[in-house]
């Protein structure tokens, strides 16, 4: 599995190195397995010049976690006292000790001080050096690697060493063990949208009445979900406030772009209180473009705005359309979300991540500007309906990104993500055709970025045939399995400890399990899931039979892509009410939600199968299929209005 490709913080080197290292040096990163699409070729010429970048460890990450829990805990006297952008940057900047010690090491090994510079965001030390110098410095060997699909070459090593005393000061070094994904090579995407389309059911296709008349009540909510159905399900009243700065942020990428014509058709049919021409505020990242023509409209973007606008109106949305059309037409990078995070946080910004699209884009028609760094303010609520398999990215990459979500939480930002549409399985390509993990493809594969403990992850439900949205319960979605389970990287969060233990006491699935952090003891003793991992989803919302307009036609759409913007829109509405009385935004909501499960509609039926198993089952209380349940807007509003 891919997670095993990178081992961080190993206590001692294994195997024999061509260049011996001092006794106090240890392996910092090692690639255990060469990806199948790459071939190791000859040693790099020792005279070759390498642009070296040393990522410095950020300060106070543990303190940041504790502080976020404190200002997010409803029992804390500091609840809601969020930090400013400047306070967050200052808190996490690499310490001067880290900078000085790493620089001193480089100079002691013959890298002259006038060759070393620090990046403008203070996160990296950088210098140019010959391959011979770097191999001696890191006790490694550099090779040329060839990508089998494209013939393109890349420079990397199998492993590298740093002094034991400096391990805690160094995040990672490039060029290092990572192999770049190659532009222009067709392959299965490791990142995907959380939605799929289906034809209108026959009952709607046969009727000759206008959809607005047909669906102007809740009688057919079991067949087609409209804004009226969502309001009935969650007791959502019509909005009346639009505080400047409280717009709902929606992330889009992979070339999925909304159509204004589709929005107008949806508004005129299902949300006539919203004027024609209403559109999100575009904040384009790295050459992205929106909107598009109706013939090229993306179902994901159309869904996100059509399902959320009726909830938040008269408030508006902000569209963070990300990456230039050249890249998004054939997204061949295993990394994801970092170019967006760069754009809203200059301190995070880096031009060297080998897993993300590089800018300026040298390709014909590519974005020729510099990588956008810190050019936009983050929204107070952000909805993300994209993701992939946790096993497809290095642990260090995911932990650095997860720490960034923590920083946004400290600033009062709520980040809501879809849990995925593959149950307990992963998706796309590696490591097996079934997308499950382990040598036999039976180990459950958790989702990315849904497992980060600083995000609010939303699973999917549907309304059974014949059910009344005003009085009948939803069940876990069945047309696809809602993503849920336990991380192989992150430990179970403190805020969910009791809820998860209660689940195991009431509805233990009986599967063999293992206990692992950072994939340290993956699949030991025949286990198929990580019992102590961060559990997800946190909550759920409607995720099937949703009516939208796409490419000018009404259609049904499903996926946890629908659930995430519904819950995000509800948080935006709650923020409106808190801001109106001088209170802060709700920020990171998970500690409050787990402390008050009574504000949810508990979902007790359904499961999320995968890997040849039944997966997990919905149960009373929290479960790894539908989380705490679906929102009851008035109860959620009363709860958050009662807090400072």
From Swiss-Prot:
Residue ranges of the propeptide: 19-196
Keyword Manganese attributed: no
GO MF annotation list: endopeptidase activity; metal ion binding; serine-type endopeptidase activity; tripeptidyl-peptidase activity
Subcellular location: Secreted, Extracellular space
Glycosites: 235, 326, 332, 519
Documented EC number(s): 3.4.14.10
Top EC group: hydrolase
Domain of life: Eukaryota
SMART domains per record: Pro-kuma_activ
Entry's cofactor comment: Binds 1 Ca(2+) ion per subunit.
Cleavable signal peptide: 1-18
Co-factor(s): Ca(2+)
GO annotations of cellular component type: extracellular region
Role of this protein: Secreted tripeptidyl-peptidase which degrades proteins at acidic pHs and is involved in virulence.
Name the record gives this protein: Tripeptidyl-peptidase sed1
Chain's gene name: sed1
